[in-house]
Amino acid sequence: MSAPVPRLEEVARDLFFFRRPERWPAWPYLPVVRRNPDGSMDLGVLYDFEHTSGRTGYGCTVFLCNVVFVPDTEEELIALPREVYDTFEEVSSARWTVD
């Protein structure tokens, strides 16, 4: 069974939030979820490094963890498993959506 194709409005909404950390309700984190064809879910977070520590290179990185259990430090966050993308469009294409 293949994953359902997201509607254009849903993709536009996700891209809007991916690009605007000032709109993230749990700033500096944005919880994201990927719903798999088998019914399981992958949980992750985007983290606003730019406006916290100024680190670069992690803007389109999904850290694989539940937002409730994010580590206390950036170093611990960076040590988590992650999926790295070049653009937010790629994040969306990998089926990550705002949770």
What do the predicted segments below correspond to?
Residues 1-99:
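Terminus-proximal functional modules
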